[in-house]
Amino acid sequence: MKNIAMKTTVVLTILLLSVLTAINADTMKKRSDYCSNDFCFFSCRRDRCARGDCENGKCVCKNCHLN
């Protein structure tokens, strides 16, 4: 009986870890692909640019001052 409980615990632990890993990978992918005009605007303002637009999933800063 003890052996069956141990095997069940190991299997459930492995399943839980695989689910958590899949969720984390999906979350990280969404974060790296995240792009919105508001996010780009504030990101580009930090770099002293007047505008920031989301184009093709990437932030594009416009009207930047280089000093």
Curated annotation (Swiss-Prot):
Which superkingdom, per the lineage? Eukaryota
Q: Is Lipid metabolism there in the keyword field?
A: no
Pro-sequence residue ranges: 26-31
Q: List the disulfide bonds.
A: 35-54, 40-59, 44-61, 49-64
Task: Report the GO molecular function annotations.
Answer: potassium channel regulator activity; toxin activity
Q: Which UniProt keywords apply?
A: Cleavage on pair of basic residues, Disulfide bond, Ion channel impairing toxin, Neurotoxin, Potassium channel impairing toxin, Secreted, Signal, Toxin
Give the primary localization class.
secreted
Quote the tissue specificity entry: Expressed by the venom gland.
Which cell locations does it reside in?
Answer: Secreted
Family to which the UniProt record says this protein belongs: Belongs to the short scorpion toxin superfamily. Potassium channel inhibitor family.
Return the protein name: Potassium channel toxin alpha-KTx
Look up and give the organism this protein is from: Hoffmannihadrurus gertschi
The organism's lineage? Eukaryota, Metazoa, Ecdysozoa, Arthropoda, Chelicerata
